[in-house]
From Swiss-Prot:
Reported function: Required for the maturation of SdpC to SDP. Not required for SdpC signal peptide cleavage, secretion from the cell or disulfide bond formation.
GO biological process: bacteriocin biosynthetic process
Membrane-spanning ranges: 27-49, 70-92, 112-134, 155-177, 219-241, 248-270
Principal localisation: membrane
Gene name linked to the record: sdpB
Protein's UniProt name: Sporulation-delaying protein SdpB
Source organism per UniProt: Bacillus subtilis (strain 168)
Membrane association type: Multi-pass membrane protein
Top-level taxon of the source organism: Bacteria
């Protein structure tokens, strides 16, 4: 009974209208916007736009309708770019939320996608849809200090946000466990093959620089660290706020590293947005203090080690010159 009363009290003050939710939506929309800005429909449908069909889908995509009514795919792309720009700047979430999901769904279902990011974007934009429909603000960047919605709406908002967190938890847990079933990941050689892959691998100049490391025994350690780190991110769902913040910073750095190494920018941004809504408190605004626990830990540890090393050095020099 006490737990139920505590939960009821928490929900009664629940207020997700902070910049955490706004940054999540904007990054998620921006990732898809980049795909459409830098890839024409000739690339997105390089397998042949004539093969786009609505026969095997429950909900026809925008490109299915375009083909049916002989509308140029580029017109659809430009329209999507316009709508996603509205999503990124935060205009009228109640109106743009549904279009955001439908754009992600259309790209995932009809276009040529290869890295899995669009599928995650489709799922997340669908799960956040009820929240956007309940968001009556003109812009999702307009922060509300208090949430004056009814208790029923607050309850829906709370459970939807919880479901999204569980979904991100499943993504990381599944990624780690599925790797353990794979022979190359279990043996610790998967990173070598992945970085050498002609599609997802490193650019040639980076590969030449990394080859000594990739061909060494240390690659086994690196490969296993990736799996362990993803298990750590999954386990962070039940950790305290300090661990969550450390996991968030490390997770963002991890995906930034992937972006700069193998160039899957949209996927990286999607996962960073997922980490933000997963690990940062939804009811708190993101400030520069959110990463302070990690940097404070590094600073304190570094300072202690510096003092210890410095002290040992002084003792050594004293013995050397004054003994």
């Amino acid at each position: 009974m006490k737990i139920l009363n505590s939960l009821e009290g928490y929900i009664d003050t629940y207020n997700p209208w902070k910049n955490t939710y706004a940054l999540f939506r904007s990054l998620l929309g921006f990732s898809t916007l980049l795909v459409l800005l830098f890839n024409s429909t000739d690339i997105l449908f390089s397998y042949s736009a004539n093969n786009v069909t609505c026969e095997n889908v429950y909900i026809p995509t925008a490109f299915c309708f375009a083909k049916e009514y002989s509308i140029n795919f580029e017109i659809i792309r430009y329209l999507m770019i316009f709508i996603l720009t509205l999503v990124v700047i935060g205009w009228r979430p109640r109106f743009t939320g549904l279009f955001h999901w439908y754009i992600c769904y259309s790209i995932q279902t009809s276009a040529l996608t290869i890295d899995g990011g669009e599928q995650i974007a489709t799922v997340l934009s669908f799960l956040i849809l009820p929240v956007t429909l309940l968001d009556s603000r003109r812009n999702h960047w307009n922060i509300k200090k208090n949430n004056n919605e009814s208790f029923t709406k607050k309850t829906v908002l709370f459970y939807i946000m919880t479901i999204i967190k569980i979904q991100v938890f499943i993504i990381y847990l599944n990624a780690a466990l599925e790797r353990l079933k794979n022979k190359e990941w279990a043996e610790g050689t998967a990173i070598y093959y992945f970085f050498s892959d002609p599609v997802f691998g490193l650019p040639e100049y980076q590969l030449n620089l990394m080859n000594p490391l990739l061909e060494s025994n240390f690659i086994v350690v690196i490969t296993w660290l990736v799996t362990i780190f993803e298990l750590f991110l999954a386990a962070s769902i039940i950790s305290n706020i300090r661990i969550k913040r450390i996991a968030l910073v490390l997770g963002i750095l991890f995906h930034i590293g992937i972006i700069f190494s193998i160039g899957i920018v949209s996927f990286g941004l999607i996962m960073i947005s997922a980490l933000i809504i997963y690990l940062h408190p939804v009811q708190q605004n993101i400030t520069m203090n959110w990463c302070s626990p990690l940097f404070k830990y590094i600073y304190v540890k570094g300072k202690r080690n510096f003092k210890r090393i410095g002290g040992e050095s002084v003792k050594f020099l004293t013995k050397l010159f004054h003994s």
